């Protein structure tokens, strides 16, 4: 009986996470609809405000209005707050306010916090939450300070706001920029393709935000003693390194051939880092080769790591599936890595998440392509960007109809709350202590 009660508590915590994100999105949309949220002082249509709020809370970066020219200072501030809440997580922010007010965190709340940041255990969760919040603000502050000289040199005193906004947006893997003007909309960071300070700072912020809070904790606790890290941290760091270096080498030889060597290296690295849920771009994406776009779609679907500011199906999901395939080839019963066996339930979970993300990506792309009369490849790029909470686009987002925008809203939301979180929140728990059905083999492959 206690086991069932515990499961119900876990289920309610997943529902709280799902509903918490939805509540913040709706509230953000209502505020963005207000006339003083836009520079023109007009009421923003609800579907556009909802799209922007969803993109901010789900740290995606897809927009239907240029953030720099359409939204007022107030509107941009609201978007920044939504990005910060979405990056940290609704539950983490709620826990922060509870701790600041001196309230005691109950066991149920600790369990919810555990699920929200993918922590392995409830013990020490309050300490970990404090560590996450302090680390987040410190890293964002450092990123802001490093970018200050460049932005203040270009924009004067306004450069302080520019540096702060882009530091938070990069660390939270959001991809929102406020560099657009009425004459030059949706520029992202194309004007800084050869600027080492901006490129390197943004890339580091994206990577640190995307490797996960538990990996931070591991690194801070064990320093550079890689062997002492948790198995999950090792898998995350190795997978992340591979997913950065391999595509960067490909992009270097297949794209950006007209750039000087230094800019070509920066552009290749940047476009390798940013598809994994960040959404900034320094290059003109539509001009990249078809094979490069296909690689970027795969990177967008993978996304960041568990318990991070990033979305997507996660680096660990990809790693577990590949390791499981290797174990089959080697005729082993269990997948193995770093001298450890991977739990069979993790393999099943990884398969479920991968199938769910692929179906959302593919079905969404087909529907949008049919509704808009656009090439399927272009629409699949858009849906991969949405479900992976990336924010990269080939330029079609602002021109999409209401139906297609609503599809992207749903994909962004599902991509941020996470596949397993959504499944656990939606599917009721069943008592599995009864008799099992007869076992029968089925041929695959």
Model-derived regions: residue spans:
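Membrane-proximal intracellular helices of multi-pass ion channels
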Residues: 1-445
């Amino acid at each position: 009986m206690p086991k069932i009660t515990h499961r119900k508590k876990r289920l309610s915590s997943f529902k709280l996470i799902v509903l918490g994100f939805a509540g913040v999105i709706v509230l953000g949309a209502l505020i963005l609809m207000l006339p003083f949220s836009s520079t023109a002082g007009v009421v923003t249509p609800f579907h556009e405000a909802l799209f922007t709020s969803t993109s901010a809370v789900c740290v995606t970066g897809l927009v239907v209005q240029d953030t720099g020219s359409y939204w007022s200072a107030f509107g941009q501030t609201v978007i920044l707050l939504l990005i910060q809440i979405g990056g940290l997580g609704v539950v983490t922010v709620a826990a922060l306010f509870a701790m600041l007010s001196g309230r005691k965190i109950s066991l149920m709340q600790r369990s919810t916090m555990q699920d929200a940041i993918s922590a392995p255990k409830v013990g020490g969760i309050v300490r970990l939450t404090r560590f996450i919040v302090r680390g987040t603000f410190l890293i964002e502050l450092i990123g802001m300070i490093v970018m200050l000289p460049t932005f203040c040199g270009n924009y004067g005193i306004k450069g302080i706001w520019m540096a702060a906004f882009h530091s938070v947006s990069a660390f939270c893997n959001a991809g929102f920029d406020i560099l657009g003007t009425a004459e030059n909309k949706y520029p992202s960071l194309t004007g800084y393709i050869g600027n080492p300070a901006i490129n390197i700072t943004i890339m580091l912020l994206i990577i640190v935000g995307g490797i996960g809070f538990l990996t931070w904790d591991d690194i801070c606790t064990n320093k550079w003693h890689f062997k002492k890290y948790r198995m999950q941290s090792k898998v995350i760091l190795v997978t992340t390194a591979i997913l950065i270096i391999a595509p960067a080498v490909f992009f270097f030889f297949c794209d950006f051939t007209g750039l000087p060597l230094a800019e070509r290296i920066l552009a290749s690295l940047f476009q390798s880092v940013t598809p994994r849920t960040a959404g900034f771009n320094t290059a003109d994406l539509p001009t990249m080769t078809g094979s490069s776009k296909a690689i970027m779609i795969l990177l967008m679907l993978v996304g960041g790591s568990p318990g991070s500011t990033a979305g997507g199906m996660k680096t660990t999901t990809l790693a577990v599936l590949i390791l499981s395939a290797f174990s089959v080839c080697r005729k082993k019963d269990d997948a193995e890595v770093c001298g450890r066996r991977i739990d069979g339930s993790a393999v099943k979970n990884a398969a479920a998440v991968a199938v769910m993300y692929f179906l959302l990506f593919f079905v969404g792309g087909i529907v949008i392509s049919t509704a808009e009369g656009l090439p399927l490849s272009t629409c699949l790029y858009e849906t991969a960007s949405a479900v992976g909470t990336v924010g990269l686009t080939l330029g079609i987002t602002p021109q999409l109809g209401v139906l297609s925008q609503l599809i992207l809203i749903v994909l962004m939301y599902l991509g941020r709350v996470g596949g397993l979180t959504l499944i656990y929140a939606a599917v009721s728990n069943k008592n599995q202590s009864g008799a099992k059905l007869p076992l029968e083999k089925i041929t695959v492959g």
